[in-house]
Amino acid sequence: MAVCAASRRLTLSNVLQGVYRTELVRQHAENSAINFYAQRLTRPALTAANSNPWLSKRSFSTSQAFKDGGNIVIYDVIATKAPDGDVLTELTSTKAEDSPKTPKSPKSSSEKPKSSKTKTKAAKKSGTKYLASELVNPEKKVKRPHWQTQKEALEKKFTEGWHPRKKLPPDSLDTIRHLHATKPDVWTTPVLADQFKISPEAIRRILKSKWQPTEEERERREERWAERYKKIYSHMEELGLRRRKGEWTAKVSDARRLGLEGKSIRQNFRRKPQARPEGTEINISRPDREASPKESTSLE
Protein backbone atom coordinates (compact mmCIF):
# COMPACT_ATOMS: atom_id res chain seq x y z
CA MET A 1 0.00 0.00 0.00
CA ALA A 2 1.19 3.50 -0.79
CA VAL A 3 1.53 5.77 2.19
CA CYS A 4 1.09 9.55 1.85
CA ALA A 5 4.10 11.50 3.03
CA ALA A 6 1.96 14.44 4.22
CA SER A 7 -0.14 12.18 6.48
CA ARG A 8 2.94 11.09 8.37
CA ARG A 9 3.58 14.69 9.43
CA LEU A 10 0.14 15.00 11.08
CA THR A 11 1.12 13.50 14.41
CA LEU A 12 -0.34 14.48 17.75
CA SER A 13 2.83 16.10 18.96
CA ASN A 14 3.15 18.29 15.86
CA VAL A 15 -0.46 19.46 16.04
CA LEU A 16 -0.24 20.38 19.75
CA GLN A 17 3.01 22.19 19.21
CA GLY A 18 1.51 24.22 16.37
CA VAL A 19 -1.53 25.23 18.40
CA TYR A 20 0.63 26.28 21.32
CA ARG A 21 2.80 28.44 19.11
CA THR A 22 -0.17 30.16 17.46
CA GLU A 23 -1.55 31.21 20.83
CA LEU A 24 1.82 32.60 21.80
CA VAL A 25 1.89 34.55 18.56
CA ARG A 26 -1.47 36.14 19.28
CA GLN A 27 -0.51 37.14 22.82
CA HIS A 28 2.75 38.72 21.76
CA ALA A 29 1.14 40.44 18.82
CA GLU A 30 -1.51 42.05 21.01
CA ASN A 31 0.85 43.36 23.68
CA SER A 32 4.46 44.17 23.05
CA ALA A 33 5.47 42.79 19.69
CA ILE A 34 3.33 45.20 17.68
CA ASN A 35 4.76 48.30 19.37
CA PHE A 36 8.32 47.04 19.17
CA TYR A 37 8.27 46.21 15.48
CA ALA A 38 6.25 49.29 14.59
CA GLN A 39 8.95 51.47 16.14
CA ARG A 40 11.56 49.45 14.37
CA LEU A 41 9.88 49.91 11.00
CA THR A 42 9.29 53.64 11.44
CA ARG A 43 12.65 54.50 13.04
CA PRO A 44 15.36 51.85 12.62
CA ALA A 45 17.78 51.55 15.47
CA LEU A 46 21.43 52.54 14.98
CA THR A 47 23.33 49.30 14.82
CA ALA A 48 26.69 48.19 13.49
CA ALA A 49 24.99 46.90 10.34
CA ASN A 50 23.43 50.31 9.61
CA SER A 51 26.62 52.24 10.34
CA ASN A 52 28.79 49.95 8.25
CA PRO A 53 27.55 49.36 4.67
CA TRP A 54 29.69 46.27 4.33
CA LEU A 55 27.90 44.64 7.25
CA SER A 56 24.48 45.89 6.19
CA LYS A 57 24.71 43.99 2.90
CA ARG A 58 25.26 40.72 4.69
CA SER A 59 22.10 39.05 6.02
CA PHE A 60 22.64 37.57 9.46
CA SER A 61 20.83 37.48 12.82
CA THR A 62 21.97 37.58 16.40
CA SER A 63 22.42 34.55 18.62
CA GLN A 64 19.47 35.58 20.77
CA ALA A 65 17.14 35.42 17.76
CA PHE A 66 18.28 31.89 17.03
CA LYS A 67 17.72 30.85 20.65
CA ASP A 68 14.17 32.15 20.65
CA GLY A 69 12.51 30.78 17.51
CA GLY A 70 9.22 32.47 18.33
CA ASN A 71 10.57 35.95 17.68
CA ILE A 72 11.39 35.07 14.09
CA VAL A 73 7.88 33.74 13.53
CA ILE A 74 6.36 36.85 15.12
CA TYR A 75 8.28 39.19 12.81
CA ASP A 76 7.32 37.21 9.73
CA VAL A 77 3.66 37.01 10.70
CA ILE A 78 3.36 40.72 11.46
CA ALA A 79 5.23 41.80 8.36
CA THR A 80 3.32 39.54 6.00
CA LYS A 81 -0.01 39.46 7.91
CA ALA A 82 -0.59 35.86 6.91
CA PRO A 83 -3.74 34.02 8.14
CA ASP A 84 -3.68 31.43 10.91
CA GLY A 85 -4.11 28.56 8.47
CA ASP A 86 -0.87 29.37 6.74
CA VAL A 87 0.89 29.61 10.07
CA LEU A 88 -0.40 26.18 11.09
CA THR A 89 0.80 24.60 7.87
CA GLU A 90 4.22 26.15 8.30
CA LEU A 91 4.44 25.07 11.94
CA THR A 92 3.27 21.50 11.30
CA SER A 93 5.85 21.00 8.58
CA THR A 94 9.05 19.12 9.29
CA LYS A 95 11.07 22.28 8.64
CA ALA A 96 9.84 23.69 11.94
CA GLU A 97 11.05 20.62 13.79
CA ASP A 98 14.53 20.87 12.38
CA SER A 99 16.75 23.02 14.48
CA PRO A 100 18.10 25.98 12.53
CA LYS A 101 21.77 25.83 11.79
CA THR A 102 23.70 28.57 13.44
CA PRO A 103 25.76 30.39 10.82
CA LYS A 104 29.27 31.46 11.53
CA SER A 105 29.46 34.68 13.40
CA PRO A 106 30.77 37.37 11.11
CA LYS A 107 33.70 39.54 12.00
CA SER A 108 32.91 42.53 14.10
CA SER A 109 33.00 45.99 12.63
CA SER A 110 35.99 46.96 14.74
CA GLU A 111 38.18 44.25 13.20
CA LYS A 112 37.86 45.43 9.59
CA PRO A 113 39.52 48.83 9.86
CA LYS A 114 42.29 47.22 11.84
CA SER A 115 42.89 44.75 9.05
CA SER A 116 42.84 47.55 6.45
CA LYS A 117 45.29 49.57 8.52
CA THR A 118 47.59 46.61 8.85
CA LYS A 119 47.39 46.05 5.08
CA THR A 120 48.27 49.66 4.32
CA LYS A 121 51.15 49.55 6.80
CA ALA A 122 52.43 46.34 5.24
CA ALA A 123 52.17 47.87 1.76
CA LYS A 124 54.08 50.97 2.88
CA LYS A 125 56.76 48.85 4.50
CA SER A 126 57.11 46.72 1.38
CA GLY A 127 57.33 49.86 -0.79
CA THR A 128 60.01 51.41 1.42
CA LYS A 129 61.94 48.15 1.43
CA TYR A 130 61.75 48.00 -2.37
CA LEU A 131 62.99 51.58 -2.70
CA ALA A 132 65.78 50.94 -0.22
CA SER A 133 66.86 47.85 -2.13
CA GLU A 134 66.90 49.88 -5.35
CA LEU A 135 69.06 52.55 -3.76
CA VAL A 136 71.43 50.07 -2.18
CA ASN A 137 71.69 47.79 -5.22
CA PRO A 138 71.06 49.93 -8.31
CA GLU A 139 70.98 48.20 -11.66
CA LYS A 140 74.33 48.26 -13.38
CA LYS A 141 74.31 50.25 -16.60
CA VAL A 142 75.35 48.32 -19.65
CA LYS A 143 78.65 49.67 -20.94
CA ARG A 144 78.30 50.76 -24.53
CA PRO A 145 81.05 50.10 -27.06
CA HIS A 146 83.51 52.84 -27.98
CA TRP A 147 82.37 53.10 -31.58
CA GLN A 148 78.80 53.89 -30.52
CA THR A 149 79.84 56.82 -28.30
CA GLN A 150 82.13 58.10 -31.05
CA LYS A 151 79.32 57.90 -33.58
CA GLU A 152 76.95 59.89 -31.37
CA ALA A 153 79.61 62.57 -30.84
CA LEU A 154 80.20 62.87 -34.59
CA GLU A 155 76.47 63.12 -35.27
CA LYS A 156 76.25 66.04 -32.84
CA LYS A 157 79.21 67.80 -34.47
CA PHE A 158 78.27 67.12 -38.10
CA THR A 159 74.57 67.82 -38.39
CA GLU A 160 74.58 67.33 -42.16
CA GLY A 161 76.05 63.84 -41.85
CA TRP A 162 78.90 62.31 -43.81
CA HIS A 163 77.68 63.73 -47.11
CA PRO A 164 77.57 67.53 -46.71
CA ARG A 165 75.92 69.73 -49.30
CA LYS A 166 79.11 71.67 -50.04
CA LYS A 167 82.39 69.88 -50.78
CA LEU A 168 85.59 71.88 -51.09
CA PRO A 169 88.09 71.08 -53.87
CA PRO A 170 91.73 70.28 -53.03
CA ASP A 171 92.84 73.79 -54.02
CA SER A 172 90.50 75.29 -51.43
CA LEU A 173 91.87 72.94 -48.78
CA ASP A 174 95.42 74.03 -49.59
CA THR A 175 94.30 77.67 -49.47
CA ILE A 176 92.74 77.20 -46.04
CA ARG A 177 95.94 75.65 -44.69
CA HIS A 178 98.09 78.36 -46.24
CA LEU A 179 96.00 81.24 -44.86
CA HIS A 180 95.93 79.80 -41.38
CA ALA A 181 99.67 79.10 -41.45
CA THR A 182 100.64 82.61 -42.60
CA LYS A 183 98.26 84.64 -40.38
CA PRO A 184 96.68 82.49 -37.67
CA ASP A 185 95.50 85.54 -35.71
CA VAL A 186 93.58 86.97 -38.65
CA TRP A 187 92.39 83.78 -40.35
CA THR A 188 90.89 82.04 -37.36
CA THR A 189 88.58 79.05 -37.49
CA PRO A 190 85.30 81.04 -37.33
CA VAL A 191 86.54 83.46 -40.02
CA LEU A 192 87.53 80.62 -42.36
CA ALA A 193 84.21 78.87 -41.71
CA ASP A 194 82.32 82.05 -42.59
CA GLN A 195 84.46 82.69 -45.67
CA PHE A 196 84.17 79.19 -47.17
CA LYS A 197 80.58 78.60 -45.90
CA ILE A 198 81.26 75.38 -44.02
CA SER A 199 81.05 74.32 -40.37
CA PRO A 200 83.84 75.23 -37.90
CA GLU A 201 84.34 71.55 -37.09
CA ALA A 202 85.13 70.86 -40.76
CA ILE A 203 87.71 73.68 -40.71
CA ARG A 204 89.32 72.20 -37.59
CA ARG A 205 89.62 68.80 -39.23
CA ILE A 206 91.06 70.31 -42.41
CA LEU A 207 93.73 72.14 -40.42
CA LYS A 208 94.42 69.08 -38.29
CA SER A 209 94.94 66.71 -41.23
CA LYS A 210 98.47 66.45 -42.67
CA TRP A 211 97.70 64.41 -45.74
CA GLN A 212 99.40 65.47 -48.96
CA PRO A 213 98.89 63.94 -52.41
CA THR A 214 101.79 62.31 -54.24
CA GLU A 215 103.15 63.43 -57.60
CA GLU A 216 101.24 60.72 -59.44
CA GLU A 217 98.04 61.74 -57.73
CA ARG A 218 98.59 65.37 -58.72
CA GLU A 219 99.19 64.45 -62.37
CA ARG A 220 96.01 62.38 -62.46
CA ARG A 221 94.12 65.22 -60.88
CA GLU A 222 95.37 67.75 -63.47
CA GLU A 223 94.43 65.45 -66.35
CA ARG A 224 91.01 64.90 -64.85
CA TRP A 225 90.48 68.62 -64.45
CA ALA A 226 91.59 69.34 -68.05
CA GLU A 227 89.09 66.84 -69.43
CA ARG A 228 86.39 68.28 -67.25
CA TYR A 229 87.07 71.84 -68.43
CA LYS A 230 87.00 70.73 -72.07
CA LYS A 231 83.58 69.19 -71.61
CA ILE A 232 82.29 72.28 -69.84
CA TYR A 233 83.63 74.72 -72.44
CA SER A 234 82.37 72.66 -75.38
CA HIS A 235 78.91 72.52 -73.85
CA MET A 236 78.95 76.29 -73.29
CA GLU A 237 80.01 76.87 -76.92
CA GLU A 238 77.11 74.74 -78.13
CA LEU A 239 74.69 76.79 -76.05
CA GLY A 240 76.20 80.05 -77.33
CA LEU A 241 77.42 81.16 -73.91
CA ARG A 242 81.08 81.12 -74.97
CA ARG A 243 82.76 82.13 -78.20
CA ARG A 244 84.53 79.53 -80.22
CA LYS A 245 88.27 79.55 -80.09
CA GLY A 246 89.26 81.39 -83.30
CA GLU A 247 92.46 82.25 -85.09
CA TRP A 248 92.81 85.66 -83.52
CA THR A 249 92.83 84.09 -80.10
CA ALA A 250 95.35 81.48 -81.24
CA LYS A 251 97.79 84.20 -82.30
CA VAL A 252 97.66 85.88 -78.94
CA SER A 253 98.04 82.63 -77.01
CA ASP A 254 101.19 81.97 -75.01
CA ALA A 255 101.75 78.65 -76.77
CA ARG A 256 102.03 80.41 -80.13
CA ARG A 257 104.51 82.94 -78.78
CA LEU A 258 106.64 80.26 -77.20
CA GLY A 259 106.59 78.22 -80.42
CA LEU A 260 104.78 75.26 -78.87
CA GLU A 261 101.85 75.48 -81.28
CA GLY A 262 102.02 75.49 -85.11
CA LYS A 263 101.04 78.58 -87.05
CA SER A 264 97.61 78.74 -88.55
CA ILE A 265 96.99 78.38 -92.27
CA ARG A 266 96.04 82.02 -92.69
CA GLN A 267 99.28 83.78 -91.84
CA ASN A 268 98.48 87.16 -93.33
CA PHE A 269 95.55 88.05 -91.15
CA ARG A 270 96.13 91.79 -91.73
CA ARG A 271 97.19 93.56 -94.88
CA LYS A 272 100.85 94.36 -95.05
CA PRO A 273 101.86 97.86 -96.23
CA GLN A 274 102.95 98.06 -99.88
CA ALA A 275 106.68 98.10 -100.45
CA ARG A 276 107.93 101.48 -101.67
CA PRO A 277 111.19 102.25 -103.28
CA GLU A 278 113.84 104.03 -101.33
CA GLY A 279 113.86 107.81 -101.39
CA THR A 280 110.09 108.23 -101.52
CA GLU A 281 108.48 110.76 -99.25
CA ILE A 282 105.51 110.20 -97.00
CA ASN A 283 103.12 113.11 -96.72
CA ILE A 284 101.25 113.29 -93.41
CA SER A 285 98.39 115.76 -93.34
CA ARG A 286 97.97 117.81 -90.16
CA PRO A 287 94.95 120.11 -90.35
CA ASP A 288 95.67 121.97 -87.11
CA ARG A 289 99.35 122.48 -87.70
CA GLU A 290 101.60 123.67 -90.40
CA ALA A 291 103.28 121.31 -92.76
CA SER A 292 106.41 119.74 -91.36
CA PRO A 293 109.74 120.51 -92.97
CA LYS A 294 110.83 118.33 -95.84
CA GLU A 295 114.03 117.22 -94.14
CA SER A 296 112.10 115.59 -91.28
CA THR A 297 109.88 113.63 -93.66
CA SER A 298 112.66 112.10 -95.68
CA LEU A 299 113.50 108.48 -95.07
CA GLU A 300 117.06 107.48 -95.01
From Swiss-Prot:
The keyword Mitochondrion applies. Its main location: mitochondrion. Residues 1-67 form a transit peptide. One of its GO terms (cellular component) is nucleus. Keywords: Mitochondrion, Transit peptide. It is found in: Mitochondrion. Residues 115-127 have a biased composition (Basic residues). It comes from the Eukaryota. Residues 91-132, 259-300 are annotated as: Disordered. Required for respiratory activity and maintenance and expression of the mitochondrial genome. Belongs to the RRG9 family. This is Required for respiratory growth protein 9, mitochondrial. It comes from Talaromyces marneffei (strain ATCC 18224 / CBS 334.59 / QM 7333) (Penicillium marneffei).
